UniProtKB/Swiss-Prot annotation:
Function: Converts the free carboxyl group of a malonyl-thioester to its methyl ester by transfer of a methyl group from S-adenosyl-L-methionine (SAM). It allows to synthesize pimeloyl-ACP via the fatty acid synthetic pathway.
Annotated metabolic or biological route of this protein: Cofactor biosynthesis; biotin biosynthesis
Matches recorded under InterPro entries: BioC, Malonyl-ACP_OMT, Methyltransf_11, SAM-dependent_MTases_sf
GO BP terms: biotin biosynthetic process; methylation
Family that this chain belongs to: Belongs to the methyltransferase superfamily.
Name of the protein in its database record: Malonyl-[acyl-carrier protein] O-methyltransferase
EC number: 2.1.1.197
Enzymatic reactions: malonyl-[ACP] + S-adenosyl-L-methionine = malonyl-[ACP] methyl ester + S-adenosyl-L-homocysteine
HAMAP family referenced in this protein's UniProt entry, alphabetically: BioC
Taxonomic source organism: Hahella chejuensis (strain KCTC 2396)
Top-level taxon of the source organism: Bacteria
Disulfides per UniProt: none
């Protein structure tokens, strides 16, 4: 019987690189997702849909040692365990609040639940058959550190299956803010080509597949509330400081309404699904 334990935090405090995207403050990422732990599963429909596709892709093999990196609430960790009941499964997340939630709701699913930085995992070299990660990589400044870490812990022939957000994500929201102020209100994301180049540079072989997911909402304000409810609002250092005034917010909503379709106000997610093997 698996026994889930909490071990000490393994969060890197090393300087972050920039990649001209606006540096990500990891402490704010952890804080944001900790605050969203209780509401995440109710609101993260797109993230769950992408995660289910990753679980389906993972079933092509028979891994014995698996890590779920950026495990969040543990919902997908549970899905992985259902797919591979005999596997040794460990789960890590940057957010203490998410790990606490996962322990409370999915205690015996993983052998280890731990707070850890995906760029510096407490995992032995060449020890894993499958590295799994859903919607976590986009919170890094430079994906090369993550791909290098995944390559380090994978056995030869082991697989990395992960997802990230790409350049066109939430372009409707960014356009709605354009002209209201000079700040950036949506995180900057990499292209599929940049992601693939980073993976190959770290000794991985495979591809980054692109897809568009469009979710419809009653209003632009509902889009923003959902993003906050899953902890995914803009946390890069170049974000505008201070409160968003009611007058500016009304202008954003008016701009966003120009995108309205029959189903409602769209929010587009440009998703990259990475399927790689260690050479």
């Amino acid at each position: 019987m698996n026994h889930a334990v909490t071990i000490k935090s393994f969060v890197s405090t090393s300087p972050l690189s920039d990649l001209e995207r606006g540096a990500v403050d990891k402490s704010k990422v952890a804080e944001s997702f900790s605050a969203a732990a209780a509401t995440y599963d109710l609101l993260a429909g797109m993230q769950k849909e992408v995660g289910e596709s990753l679980v389906s892709l993972s079933r092509e093999g028979c891994p014995q040692d698996i890590i779920d990196v950026g495990c969040g609430t543990g919902w997908l960790t549970h899905r992985l365990k259902n797919s591979f009941p005999e596997a040794r499964l460990c789960a890590y997340d940057l957010s203490p609040g998410m790990i606490e939630y996962a322990l409370a709701h999915h205690d015996n699913v993983a052998e280890i639940w731990a707070v850890a930085d995906m760029e510096s995992l407490p995992v032995a070299n060449a020890s894993q058959d499958l590295v799994f990660s859903n919607m976590a990589m986009q919170w890094l400044d430079d994906p090369r550190a993550w791909f290098a870490e995944a390559s380090r812990v994978l056995r030869p022939g082991g697989r990395l299956i992960c997802s990230t957000l790409l350049t066109q994500t939430l372009f409707e929201l960014e356009q709605a803010w354009h002209g209201v102020d000079g700040g950036r209100h949506v995180n900057r994301f990499l292209s599929a080509e940049q992601v693939a180049e980073a993976a190959v540079s770290c000794g991985l072989r495979g591809e980054c597949r692109e897809s568009l997911y469009v979710r419809f909402h009653d209003s632009a304000l509902d889009v923003m509330k959902e993003l906050k409810g899953i902890g995914a609002h803009n946390i890069q250092s170049e974000r505008p400081q201070g409160l968003t005034g009611k007058r500016r917010l009304r202008r954003v909503i008016e701009n966003y309404e120009k995108c309205r379709q029959e189903q409602g106000v769209p929010a587009t997610y440009h998703v990259g699904v990475c399927v790689y093997s260690r050479i």
